[in-house]
Amino acid sequence: MPGPTQTLSPNGENNNDIIQDNGTIIPFRKHTVRGERSYSWGMAVNVYSTSITQETMSRHDIIAWVNDIVSLNYTKVEQLCSGAAYCQFMDMLFPGCISLKKVKFQAKLEHEYIHNFKLLQASFKRMNVDKVIPVEKLVKGRFQDNLDFIQWFKKFYDANYDGKEYDPVEARQGQDAIPPPDPGEQIFNLPKKSHHANSPTAGAAKSSPASKPGSTPSRPSSAKRASSSGSASRSDKDLETQVIQLNEQVHSLKLALEGVEKERDFYFGKLREIELLCQEHGQENDDLVQRLMEVLYASDEQEGQTEEPEAEEQAHDQQPQQQEEY
């Protein structure tokens, strides 16, 4: 697989070495890790699945491995959809490639998951990791998508871990790593009330004084029974009306959420296309392309806002030059 910058070996063949700015050469190395084809240019060892690679871990073993390495309390593979665990793995494998202060270890919402995967993408770029992160699939919390990615990441970890000691709790600097909620968990968790407690006779039984020995308890009149049954029927109708209204609200919120998700996926696809175009022309050392890449990989909104005016100024300055060339 070709490297980012290629050079020729003494015999005239392409050996995929990297020539740095100071003229030094980083030799290309080829690795084989558990049947994987992996390549390295002095940074991360890239791992690519092949047909002979069938060794995988079960869902329980892979979660136990994640919890043991980075001291988390995950119970399901789907909880890896927050991206926080991967960010800490990258800090462990390549110290300094990611800032754990910006990682949302208590992420519970999808936009927070995307924020973490954005940081992960930036760290992949810094370490020349070629793996494409399927963010739009992972943040949905589906089992198979997250299982496939963590299986690949386990092989990537085995290829790059050098055995150094690492304290994940200290590296998080006191941030509580709370597992994200299980996907599909109900938002509304209303406590159930016992039928006996809501019955009109229960309150009457509690409030009635103890009968004296020898005295005959008086029976409730027919008027009282009718009024109690009428109030119970009215309360049941009110509850049914509330249930209908809540169901309508839930339905409308689901429709709104689906619309927002479609819009998000649409713009995410556009950004992905821009990213691929920038990567294709990244070797041309175009300043505008570099600034666009910095905006795409910005770790927070403030960085993107501060970089956007500069990119626009550079684009405006370059337009007259391009017109003159044509």
From Swiss-Prot:
It comes from the Eukaryota. Residues 199-233, 317-326 have a biased composition (Low complexity). The modification Phosphotyrosine is found at Y166. Residues 170-239, 297-326 are annotated as: Disordered. Expressed during early stages of apico-basal epithelial differentiation but down-regulated in most cells at later stages. Pfam families: CH, EB1. Residues 258-301 are annotated as: APC-binding. Residues 300-312 have a biased composition (Acidic residues). SUPFAM superfamilies: Calponin-homology domain, CH-domain (SSF47576), EB1 dimerisation domain-like (SSF140612). Residues 235-305 form the EB1 C-terminal domain. Transmembrane segments: none annotated. Composed of two functionally independent domains. The N-terminal domain forms a hydrophobic cleft involved in microtubule binding and the C-terminal is involved in the formation of mutually exclusive complexes with APC and DCTN1. Interacts with DCTN1. Interacts with APC (via C-terminal). Interacts with monomeric and polymerized tubulin. Interacts with SLAIN1. Interacts (via the N-terminal region) with BAG1. Interacts with ASB14. Belongs to the MAPRE family. Adapter protein that is involved in microtubule polymerization, and spindle function by stabilizing microtubules and anchoring them at centrosomes. Therefore, ensures mitotic progression and genome stability. Acts as a central regulator of microtubule reorganization in apico-basal epithelial differentiation. Plays a role during oocyte meiosis by regulating microtubule dynamics. Participates in neurite growth by interacting with plexin B3/PLXNB3 and microtubule reorganization during apico-basal epithelial differentiation. PANTHER family: MICROTUBULE-ASSOCIATED PROTEIN RP/EB FAMILY MEMBER. This is Microtubule-associated protein RP/EB family member 2. It comes from Mus musculus (Mouse). The lineage of its organism: Eukaryota, Metazoa, Chordata, Craniata, Vertebrata.
